[in-house]
């Protein structure tokens, strides 16, 4: 296989840690702050508590009754769209 066809699978370093307080830079949740609850290193994405909520409807297929549940979950955000936030100084910075 040619080296040009092989996808570069080197994981980029994410500068955040689980538990860090971050501010969202873009999207519908812009300027909101939240705590990182998970980091996905393979795709350089983070999951922030209470931010980027998505809704999913699911049906219980084992029963014949068509009652379902609506669940909310936090979807991942790319690490370039978040910035560390300092509550002490009330500012956000990339470093």
UniProtKB/Swiss-Prot annotation:
Record's subcellular location: Plastid, Chloroplast
Keyword Endoplasmic reticulum included in the entry's annotation: no
PROSITE patterns: RIBOSOMAL_L24
Record GO terms (molecular function): rRNA binding; structural constituent of ribosome
Gene3D superfamilies for this protein: 2.30.30.30
Family: Belongs to the universal ribosomal protein uL24 family.
Free-text function comment from the UniProt entry: One of two assembly initiator proteins, it binds directly to the 5'-end of the 23S rRNA, where it nucleates assembly of the 50S subunit.
Known partners and oligomeric status: Part of the 50S ribosomal subunit.
HAMAP family: Ribosomal_uL24_B
Name the record gives this protein: Large ribosomal subunit protein uL24c
Native source organism of the sequence: Porphyra purpurea
The encoding gene: rpl24
């Amino acid at each position: 296989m040619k080296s040009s066809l092989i996808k570069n699978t080197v994981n980029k370093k994410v500068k955040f840690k689980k538990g860090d307080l971050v501010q969202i830079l873009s999207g519908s949740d812009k300027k909101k702050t939240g705590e990182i609850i998970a980091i996905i290193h393979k795709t350089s994405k983070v999951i922030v508590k209470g931010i980027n909520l998505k809704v999913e409807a699911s049906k219980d297929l084992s029963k014949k009754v068509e009652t379902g549940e609506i669940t909310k979950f936090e979807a991942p955000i790319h690490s370039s769209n978040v910035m560390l936030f300092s509550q002490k100084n009330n500012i956000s910075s990339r470093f």
